[in-house]
Curated annotation (Swiss-Prot):
Family classification: Belongs to the encephalomyocarditis virus protein 2B* family.
Ranges of biased composition (kind: Polar residues): 14-28
Start-end of Low complexity biased regions: 99-113
GO BP annotations listed: viral translational frameshifting
UniProt-recorded name of the protein: Protein 2B*
Recorded superkingdom: Viruses
Sequence ranges of Basic and acidic residues compositional bias: 114-129
Organism of this sequence: Mengo encephalomyocarditis virus
Organism classification: Viruses, Riboviria, Orthornavirae, Pisuviricota, Pisoniviricetes
Gene knockout outcome: Knockout mutants display an attenuated small-plaque phenotype.
Chain residue ranges for the region called Disordered: 1-28, 91-129
Length: 129
């Protein structure tokens, strides 16, 4: 009863993992993280805050996709529309609805770009719950 249309083209591609931030994610292993521009899993992840360590690397990327695309999708009709709008207003601030336009998004993307040099237990920037 509630699905998002799959994106035609990925926005950010990641050659290291074979996944994309705002499109289908062929390497995803968790339910709800496959070929939706924004999935319910992505919204839940965004609302809960960033993962605590780089072991959830794929989830970090998915959260960025959530924040970047949030307002673009909240007008989709569906049972959870009000809930999604609340999540977006709280956790996905992005005034002009473009990717990585906010300070948090930019900081997270910068962190991901250099993450290959980080130790596995290096803390990842996250929202306070």
């Amino acid at each position: 009863p509630f699905t998002f249309k799959p994106r035609q083209r990925p926005v950010f591609s990641d050659s290291r993992s074979g996944s994309v931030i705002n499109g289908s994610n062929p390497t995803a292993e968790r339910l709800g993280q496959q070929s939706y521009g924004i999935s319910l899993y992505g919204f839940a992840r965004c609302q809960r805050g960033r993962p605590k360590s780089n072991e959830d690397y794929k989830d970090v990327k998915f959260s960025i996709g959530c924040m970047g695309k949030c307002k673009r999708n909240i007008e989709q009709p569906g049972v959870l529309e009000t809930t999604l709008k609340q999540m977006c207003a709280t956790d996905c601030r992005d005034d002009d609805s473009s990717d990585a336009s906010g300070p948090l998004d930019a900081a997270l993307l910068g962190s991901l770009d250099s993450s290959r040099d980080h130790k596995p237990d290096k803390p990842v920037r996250r929202n306070s719950s």
